[in-house]
């Protein structure tokens, strides 16, 4: 028996009575011991070798097409034949580049849609900030004098704790 399980049996008094709390603890320990034994039995069963049956392979959901050529270049040519009506004359010279362009166009935003007003504003603001940063002008230098004055007044309105303490001591 485990040493922690042996300690569980020491809960009884000399008279042999056990409190309700100790009884719950004993029952819990007993369940833990049974679970531990069951786990050990399962581990032993798992370790013993069993005769295995030959299993038939499960039918997979994916069936590869038989006509797909193994070479990537051949695959590209096959894909280009399927999308040939979309291609222009100069794409026939460089099929891989044209295919790459088609793939990129399919994933990106359509170029026909004009930028919305918000997007234009955002791009314009971003461009302006970048230009100012290149020139070395920060936003603080561009601030209006009213904003700076307002910020200074706000700081003066809220004295620090040290100032408040000194004022209190001075007028006491």
Swiss-Prot record:
Biological processes per GO annotation: chromatin organization
Name of the molecule in the record: Putative Dresden prostate carcinoma protein 2
Molecular function terms from GO: chromatin binding
Tissue: Very high expression in prostate and prostate cancer. Faint expression in other tissues.
Superkingdom of origin organism: Eukaryota
GO cellular component: a single term: nucleus
Annotated region described as Disordered, given as residue ranges: 40-61
Species, as recorded: Homo sapiens
